[in-house]
């Protein structure tokens, strides 16, 4: 099974910069993408994979994207404190101190579902007759 970020990397690591819209529209589009990525990460990625992603983001000083359910704010100077705080959380996730699903923001995001369409999993229910015990009449 591929991790969700491997199937649609633009959702996790891209920035909608080529659509010709203004800055506010781009920021809204980026926020929507990041929210969808966080929900998918938190729901579909195993905890071990989230820890690996967090470790990678910390080791490589990543500034953008969604890693282990944490949205990084970017590399702008004015966001350096937010980035440092996010890296601290990622360090703790990577070290196994915390579970990203249990962080207050992530738990709330999962609880309210944020409009993400969940693909239903088809299921089949088969009803079998109860086996008769004892001698069977000859046909």
Swiss-Prot record:
GO terms for molecular function: 4 iron, 4 sulfur cluster binding; dinitrosyl-iron complex binding; DNA binding; metal ion binding. It comes from the Bacteria. Disruption phenotype: Not essential in culture. Gives an attenuated infection during both progressive and chronic mouse infections. Mice infected with the disrupted strain induce a stronger host immune response than wild-type. Growth inhibited by S-nitrosoglutathione (GSNO), a source of glutathione and nitric oxide. Mutant cells are less metabolically active. When chronic infection was reactivated by corticosterone the mutant strain was not able to resume growth, suggesting that WhiB5 might be involved with bacillary proliferation during reactivation. Residues 4-77 form the 4Fe-4S Wbl-type domain. The Fe-S cluster can be nitrosylated by nitric oxide (NO). Upon Fe-S cluster removal intramolecular disulfide bonds are formed. Induction: Maximal expression during progressive infection is between 2-4 weeks, however low, stable expression during chronic infection. It is found in: Cytoplasm. Its cofactor is [4Fe-4S] cluster. The keyword Nucleus does not apply. Binds 1 [4Fe-4S] cluster per subunit. Contains 1 [2Fe-2S] cluster after reconstitution of overexpressed protein from E.coli. Following nitrosylation of the [4Fe-4S] cluster binds 1 [4Fe-8(NO)] cluster per subunit. One of its GO terms (biological process) is regulation of DNA-templated transcription. [4Fe-4S] cluster binds at residues 5, 41, 45, 53. The keyword Oxidoreductase does not apply. Keywords: 4Fe-4S, Activator, Cytoplasm, Disulfide bond, DNA-binding, Iron, Iron-sulfur, Metal-binding, Transcription, Transcription regulation, Virulence. It holds the Pfam family Whib. GO terms for cellular component: cytoplasm; peptidoglycan-based cell wall. A transcription factor that is probably redox-responsive. Probably plays a role in immunomodulation and reactivation after chronic infection. Its induction results in transcription of a number of genes including sigM, and the genes for 2 type VII secretion systems ESX-2 and ESX-4. Seems to negatively regulate its own expression. The apo-form has been shown to act as a protein disulfide reductase. The apo- but not holo-form probably binds DNA. Belongs to the WhiB family. This is Transcriptional regulator WhiB5. It comes from Mycobacterium tuberculosis (strain ATCC 25618 / H37Rv). The lineage of its organism: Bacteria, Bacillati, Actinomycetota, Actinomycetes, Mycobacteriales.
């Amino acid at each position: 099974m591929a991790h969700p970020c491997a199937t649609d990397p633009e959702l996790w690591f891209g920035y909608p910069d080529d659509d010709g819209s203004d800055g506010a529209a781009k920021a809204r589009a980026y926020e929507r993408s990041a929210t969808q990525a966080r929900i998918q990460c938190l729901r579909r990625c195993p905890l071990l994979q989230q820890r690996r992603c967090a470790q990678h983001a910390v080791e490589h000083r990543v500034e953008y994207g969604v890693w282990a359910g944490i949205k990084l704010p970017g590399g702008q100077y004015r966001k350096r404190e937010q980035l440092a705080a996010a890296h601290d959380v990622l360090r703790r996730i990577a070290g196994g101190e915390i579970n990203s699903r249990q962080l207050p923001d992530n738990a709330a995001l999962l609880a309210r579902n944020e409009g993400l369409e969940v693909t239903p999993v088809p299921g089949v229910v088969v009803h079998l007759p109860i086996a008769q015990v004892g001698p069977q009449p000859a046909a």
